[in-house]
Amino acid sequence: MAAAAVVHLSVHGRLRRSPELHARPYHRPSLLRCRAFKQEADNGGEEASSSPPPPTTAEARRRRKGPLYKLKAAIQGLAGSRSAAAEAYGGEYQRAVEKAEEIFFSVATQVGRYVITMMSSGVVLGVGFQLSGGDSQMNTLIWYSWLGGVIIGTMIGANSVLEEHCKAGPRNVVITGSTRGLGKALAREFLLSGDRVVIASRSPESVLQTINELEENIQEGLSVAKKKQREILLHAKVVGTSCDVCKPEDVKKLVNFAKDELGSIDIWINNAGTNKGFRPLVNFSDEDISQIVSTNLVGSLLCTREAMNVMQHQQKGGHVFNMDGAGSGGSSTPLTAVYGSTKCGLRQFQASLLKESRRSKVGVHTASPGMVLTDLLLSGSSLRNKQMFNLICELPETVARTLVPRMRVVKGSGKAINYLTPPRILLALVTAWVRRGRWFDEEGRAVYAAEADRIRNWAESRARFSFTDAMEMYTENTWVSVFSLSVVCAFIILSSSGGPLPGT
């Protein structure tokens, strides 16, 4: 058996490897310099006279931000005495101004979301009044429904904002099965949030290759990031080690490695899993069954036990996530009976842990990514399966972008982080006709780009603001309130109709 390989790599470009890997050739990843980097000449550090002087920080911001920073500069100019204060206090004054700007824009964003939500629900309220036909009882019902939704939504929104600010800062994250597919996408998303991540896989070569790829993604992010995002990315760190989650000794080594590298573990994600295709149980070999059960169920048990042993002795505790899948709710999974039984077992395991850890500082949760276009899902899939995948499947990067922000701010225990939220399900149903052929053509051939091509333009795609992103700006409770109002309006229409509806 190959010796376990340990690879360390951070955004600062430091790379060291365990003695087992010293004999192997490797290429040091090229690092991109930040925009703010100044090229200095060899003679005493003086800048070359032939190049024009770089713009000052204030000038660069005015060019990048446009009218907003021009307005700020005008206000500072009218203040007059502020320039002297800026010179007296130097960088402290500038940092104070930047901090005030950050707080202002954060508050303005939250207020803007609240106003938009109020306006949207107000439109529904007005439609309800029009449909009621002046009935005072109906108007009272609609009014109280709207008022209750506003109060509940305001409380939930305020709590979410407080949680986000209280839990700001880098997290220490361990992800098993994170050298490809969803696990790799989760690791990338945590790194882009400024977190420190430990990746793990059976193959030392896969660990090394994945770390190099993730480092390149971070450097690409640094090259295009603005100041605030750049400061966040500078905290990112990725390290990795080989680990077979089926072996208790490997899991213990992974825990010790994470403690040595990160100091503590805030989030542990049991993502390692396998499936051997779609076929009846009688066609599965002994080795297939043993590997599926060992990886999906036994591996999660071992990792959860070791993670909880560490977290319960930490001052801030920690959170463990087990991944849901087909069969988690106890429903039948024809042609994937072994895989489904392991996921159903994890659901019972989760319920038992919740009672065991009531007074513990460790939170145990589930994460449901839905159907993700990974090798695990596509192995042995038929043409009919692929046509269905066009409607409800998503790319790993898309799912990770939704799950990670929720995982980072989770609190308590027993939370279910789901990708298929009500807005997404509604959107999938409404756009079902458009989604035909999205990932596979009529003959079942893949038409989506490979991972390397998708990640090449990841920075641009992250900057886009889609309709789904707009829907996700609001909590599920907000959408429940809006849906409840629509049900009330439908009830008014049905109850106020004088006769039977057409077609009944």
From Swiss-Prot:
Induction: Up-regulated by dark treatment, abscisic acid and methyl jasmonate. It comes from the Eukaryota. It catalyses: 7(1)-hydroxychlorophyllide a + NAD(+) = chlorophyllide b + NADH + H(+); 7(1)-hydroxychlorophyllide a + NADP(+) = chlorophyllide b + NADPH + H(+). Keywords: Chlorophyll catabolism, Chloroplast, Membrane, NAD, Oxidoreductase, Plastid, Thylakoid, Transit peptide, Transmembrane, Transmembrane helix. Its EC number is 1.1.1.294. Pfam families: adh_short. Expressed in leaves and stems. Also detected in non-photosynthetic tissues such as roots. It is found in: Plastid, Chloroplast thylakoid membrane. It is a multi-pass membrane protein. Disruption phenotype: Stay-green phenotype during senescence. Grana stacks fused into large stable stacks during semescence. NAD(+) binds at residues 175-199. InterPro entries: Chl_b_Red, NAD(P)-bd_dom_sf, SDR_fam. It is an enzyme of class 1 (oxidoreductase). One of its GO terms (biological process) is chlorophyll catabolic process. The keyword NAD applies. One of its GO terms (cellular component) is plastid. The active site is at Y339 (proton acceptor). No chlorophyll b reductase activity detected in vitro with a recombinant protein produced in a heterologous system. Belongs to the short-chain dehydrogenases/reductases (SDR) family. Interacts with NOL to form a complex that acts as a chlorophyll b reductase. Required for proper chloroplast degradation. Involved in chlorophyll b degradation. This is Probable chlorophyll(ide) b reductase NYC1, chloroplastic. It comes from Oryza sativa subsp. japonica (Rice). The gene is NYC1.
